[in-house]
Swiss-Prot record:
GO molecular function, one term: identical protein binding
EC number(s) on file: 3.1.-.-
GO BP: DNA catabolic process; DNA double-strand break processing; DNA double-strand break processing involved in repair via synthesis-dependent strand annealing; gene conversion at mating-type locus; meiotic DNA double-strand break formation; meiotic DNA double-strand break processing; telomere maintenance; telomeric 3' overhang formation
PTM info: Phosphorylated forms accumulate periodically during the unperturbed cell cycle and in response to DNA damage in G2. Phosphorylated by MEC1 and TEL1. Mutagenesis experiments showed that several of the 5 residues located in canonical (S/T)Q motifs, which are favored for phosphorylation by ATM/ATR kinases (Ser-73, Thr-90, Ser-249, Thr-279 and Ser-289) may be phosphorylated. Phosphorylated at Ser-267 by CDC28 which is required to initiate meiotic DSB resection by allowing SPO11 removal from DSB ends.
Residue ranges, annotated region (Disordered): 265-290
Recorded consequence of changing S289A: Reduces DNA damage-induced phosphorylation. Abolishes DNA damage-induced phosphorylation and function in DNA repair
InterPro entries tied to this protein: Ctp1_C (IPR013882)
Protein name: DNA endonuclease SAE2
Assembly and interaction partners: Dimer or multimer. Interacts with MRE11.
Similarity annotation: Belongs to the COM1/SAE2/CtIP family.
């Protein structure tokens, strides 16, 4: 026994607990916990029964309402003996009538909400092509497939056309025209501003141009010779074999081996200087080199944009074929004062 427990206050006023040992107190604690759990469970079960009673009554009322029309239809009685819903509702209390009326109103609302979802017509343009790819569908959906495929193809064509307009800055009056008529409308109504690159909206640079491969003297000689043969006729090999050998030797491509020797540029500024350049000399060399690049760029621009001569006689052409097509059609303009050529500061 513990002597210090005599002054301990017990809320339950059970003084016998002070005389119990530790094991006995633990057993009492276990029993008390078990009793508390059982009583709490009993209270919860009682509350559930109380809550389920109104629901059971309401369920009985609904079942009675459903069975009432069936019984009235089976018994072929007169119109005065048939019970309507209003007559049935008068047999119950006011609370029950309100609850049944609310349930009936909710059911009607559910039907009205679901009706638009069921009767909504599907959008034919948003249907996937994979829906028509099943062999189980047969030939019934053939017309739908054609309409859907035509819609998809037109949408792709319109997307490509819009991308081309954004790229070239084209604004057509008839946006519904297809891509073959796109360039015709541009030619009739619009001119491209070649003071800057219409594709990049920036100043021209040297890399926007490339040498024309059709301008080589050998190919030009071949074209002239073919034009001459078309008018006069080719000579026979037996009589003019020596002439044909000479022509074949002239038309060979050995001249392309040293093509860069014919177009050699001058030495860059400061190339022959033996000592290191000063700051002023370095800046002057940079300005001179930038001026050389500017002259080359302008020369290439003048050659590529000259539509008065045929394309095969232009020494330089644009690297983008779209620009060459615009030059051939003549739907562009530029001025020497507004021409922008990139110059590094």
């Amino acid at each position: 026994m513990v002597t210090g427990e005599e002054n301990v206050y017990l809320k339950s006023s059970l003084s016998i607990l002070k005389e119990l040992s530790l094991d006995e107190l633990l057993n009492v604690q276990y029993d008390v916990t078990t009793l508390i759990a059982k009583r709490v469970q009993a209270l919860q079960n009682r509350n559930k029964c109380v809550l389920e009673e109104p629901n059971s009554k309401l369920a009985e009322i609904l079942c009675h309402e459903k069975n009432a029309p069936q019984q009235s239809s089976q018994t072929s009685a007169g119109p005065g003996e048939q019970d309507s819903e209003d007559f049935i509702l008068t047999q119950f209390d006011e609370d029950i009538k309100k609850e049944s009326a609310e349930v009936h109103y909710r059911n009607e609302n559910k039907h009205t909400v679901q009706l638009p979802l069921v009767t909504m017509p599907p959008n034919r343009h948003k249907r996937k092509i994979s829906e028509f790819s099943s062999p189980l569908n047969g030939l019934n959906n053939l017309s739908d497939l054609e309409d859907c495929s035509d819609t998809v193809i037109h949408e792709k064509d319109n997307d490509k056309e819009n991308k081309t307009r954004k790229l070239l800055g084209i604004e057509l009056e008839n946006p519904e025209s297809t891509s073959p008529n796109l360039y015709k409308n541009v030619k009739d109504n619009f001119l491209f501003d070649f003071n800057t690159n219409p594709l990049t909206k920036r100043a021209w640079i040297l890399e926007d141009f490339r040498p024309n491969e059709d301008i080589a003297p050998v190919k030009r000689g071949r074209r002239k010779l073919e034009r001459f043969y078309a008018q006069v006729g080719k000579p026979e090999d037996s009589k003019h074999r020596s002439l044909s050998v000479v022509i074949e030797s002239q038309n060979s491509d050995y001249e392309f081996a040293f093509d860069n020797l014919r177009n050699r540029s001058k030495s860059p500024p400061g190339f022959g200087r033996l000592d290191f350049p000063s700051t002023q000399e370095g800046n002057e060399d940079k300005k001179k080199s930038q001026e050389i690049i500017r002259r080359k760029t302008k020369y290439r621009f003048l050659m590529a944009s000259n539509n008065k001569i045929p394309p095969y006689e232009r020494e330089y052409v644009f690297k983008r074929e779209q620009l060459n097509q615009i030059v051939d059609d003549g739907c562009f303009f530029w001025s020497d004062k507004l021409l922008q050529i990139y110059a590094r500061c």
